[in-house]
């Protein structure tokens, strides 16, 4: 372990090992390599992260688009409040609430375990709330800006229906900047899923 060397050398040895995939050995799990322990659990984290990313982004796009189209109505206000609450509540708090009410009180889904799809539903929902809230707010803002653009007015002047203008022009152009958010979402979900999994 190099404990007899100066601290700066120990640090450099450790960082050098990490660059080569050697994270050391676990003291808790009978001296097993840490990299093998991470590898054994990475599949579950990736599955939860991917499910949460898909669910959060898809629902966020739908809710954000509806809020933008219904701008200034109770639908817009409700979507905004839900997005703010979704961003404000930590996912581990939501996970505990889901376990208590949906898992324990209602008995709809298993409280713990791994191996069946039903066991991933509550953790996926808990993880998806953050990306959902951000995506809904982002899409709403982007679509409101897009709907007030000149080319939207031109589409209406050409005789396109409101739904055609929204689908062909507003949605398409509002989705492009969303791609920049997916990378940070994926990283946040991979790190956040560790808390939810426990």
Where are these regions (language model features)?
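Membrane-water interface segments at the C-terminal ends of transmembrane alpha-helices
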Residues: 14-16, 81-110, 126-130
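Alpha-helical transmembrane segments of integral membrane proteins
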Residues: 38-75, 91, 114-198
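Alpha-helical transmembrane segments and their lipid-water interface positions
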Residues: 20, 94-95, 144
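A general structural signal marking secondary-structure boundaries and capping sites
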Residues: 22, 89, 105-106, 146, ...
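Residues at helix-coil transition
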Residues: 2-3, 16, 20, 103, ...
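An internal, D/E-rich "acidic patch" concept
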Residues: 3-61
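N-terminal signal-anchor/first transmembrane alpha helix
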Residues: 1-6, 57, 66, 74-86
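Hydrophobic alpha-helical transmembrane segments of membrane transport/permease proteins
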Residues: 1-12, 27-28, 32, 103-122
């Amino acid at each position: 372990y190099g404990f007899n060397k100066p601290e700066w050398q120990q640090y450099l040895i450790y960082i050098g090992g990490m660059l080569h995939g050697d994270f050391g050995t676990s003291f808790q799990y009978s001296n097993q390599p840490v990299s093998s322990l991470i590898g054994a659990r990475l599949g579950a984290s990736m599955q939860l992260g991917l499910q949460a990313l898909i669910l959060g982004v898809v629902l966020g796009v739908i809710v954000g688009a509806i809020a933008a189209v219904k701008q200034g109505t109770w639908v817009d206000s409700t979507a905004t409040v839900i997005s703010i609450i979704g961003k404000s509540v930590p996912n581990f708090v939501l996970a505990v609430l889901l376990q208590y009410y949906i898992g324990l009180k209602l008995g709809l889904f298993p409280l713990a375990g791994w191996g069946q799809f039903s066991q991933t539903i509550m953790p996926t929902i808990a993880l998806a709330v953050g990306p959902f809230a951000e995506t809904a707010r982002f899409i709403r803002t982007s679509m409101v800006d897009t709907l007030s653009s000149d080319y939207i007015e031109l589409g209406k002047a050409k005789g396109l229906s409101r739904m055609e203008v929204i689908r062909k022009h507003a949605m398409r152009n509002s989705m492009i900047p969303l791609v920049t958010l997916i990378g940070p979402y994926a990283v946040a979900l991979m790190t956040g899923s560790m808390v939810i999994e426990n």
